[in-house]
Amino acid sequence: MGIFFISLVLIVLASVVFFVGGFFLGRYFLERIGTTKILEAEERAVQIVQEAQKEANEYKELKVSEVNQEWKKKRREFDQEVVIKNNKFNQMQKQVLQKEGQLKKQSQDLRDMERKLQDQRKEIEQTMETVNLRSSELERITLEQNQRLESISNLQADEARQMLVDNMLAKAREEATETIHQIHEEAEQQAERLAEKTLLTAIQRISFEQATENALSVVHIQSDELKGRIIGREGRNIKAFENATGVDIIVDDTPEVVILSCFDPLRRELAKLTLQKLLVDGIIHPVAIEKAYEDAKKEIDDVIMSAGEETISSLQIPDMPAEVVGLIGKMKYHTVYGQNLLQHSREVAMLAGLMASELKLDARVAKRAALLHDIGLVLPESDEPHAIAGRNFLKKFNESAVVLNAVAAHHGDVVKESPIAELVDAANVISLSRPGARGAVTADGNVKRLESLEEIAKGFPGVLKTYALQAGREIRVIVEGDNVSDSQADVLAHDIARKIESEVQYPGQIKVSIIRERRSIAYAK
């Protein structure tokens, strides 16, 4: 019993000692662990702060770099703008100096003319004094002659006076005739000098680049592989393209180039736009060709209107009707003696306007009449001369009588009724007289021959379109499939060929091709 109690006490004491020791030992380890955690947290905090500072510094450097780059960019733009402004200022300063020099020269010329006039006035006064002296001397001599005549011939004073007057009148008439002739010669010389000065001033103040129009357009392609797609299976794409546009398409060995050939610049430009659209889409077949052609026609209408608006804007011609503006733009695709008709009309307008300014006439009216003088060339075919057709067309838009007369008279079809008409005619002659202009008459004659071939074929019933191809060696006729049968197509080809033989002179032979196509369309609903 006593041993058990002692053992129990020992166990309790051991437990108390173990518990107390464990408590202090645990507290010790907890304090150590807490201290370690705190140190780690502090180190982590320091690390986070350092990383944040590093990121902040990097962000700051990035933003500073961006700001510096933006500042440098703005600085470069500012420097460039300053250079441009300085160049413009220097150019304007040069122009001002030139104008100042011109004004000084004109002022000096005026002073010289004033001195000359003063000298001439003095000479005239001296001449008048001499004339008065001679008149007095003449009266004295006349009196002496009268006295001598009376004493010698026993004539009455009135009779002698009449004889003397007749002699003096005859001599005066002779001198007056010589003076009038001299005045006429001087007036003609002054008029020639003034006209020469006016023309030289006008010509020197304008400059136009002119090039003879040819019948070819070049379309660049990305690779020669596209040529096969342009040709199509058994050439069907080329045939569809030529039928739609009326333009020859030439695919040869020239790398990355396709050539379009046609005498009509407008038709050739339409074909060029059509081919470019097909190349962009990458899909080439007959239906796509027709769609691209229709899209090109809409686009060319916008181009024509833009060309007309740009022309009247550059010439500062106000209040031009929209229909007339469209015809002016259409001049871009016509030629006259090898010159582009729009460029020719602009050149004539500039010349006429400058000459009108030199002669103190209305420059705006002169430019308006000159720009419109060849508008008859872009009107539908007419039996009237193009000058008369242009005048009659412009009458519908209430153009002024001066403009109408200048348009109608520039080829001598009617009498010129104003100085403006003379200026327009002169400017037209100057423009067409440039070196090489008249050398293109043969080309224009060729175009007329091709147009006559197309007109002959169009005169037959059932014909939709006609195209003269291969420099006039082939006339391709597209007919209505529903109205012209196969047998009628053969007869039509024969009739067209016979009419061409009787009305057109040409070397070699002309092939007449009739194309008859019939389409059946149905819609599934």
Swiss-Prot record:
List membrane-spanning regions: 3-23
Annotated localization: Cell membrane
Q: Which SMART domains match?
A: HDc (SM00471), KH (SM00322)
**Which GO terms of the cellular component aspect does the record hold?**
plasma membrane
Q: Which residues form the HD domain?
A: 341-433
Which terms does the record give in the GO molecular function aspect?
RNA binding; RNA endonuclease activity
Q: Pfam families from the entry? A: HD, KH_1, RNase_Y_N
Domain KH as annotated: residue spans: 215-300
Q: What is its main location?
A: membrane
| NCBIfam families, sorted | HDIG (TIGR00277), RNase_Y (TIGR03319)
Name of this chain's protein:
Ribonuclease Y
Which gene name does the record give?
rny
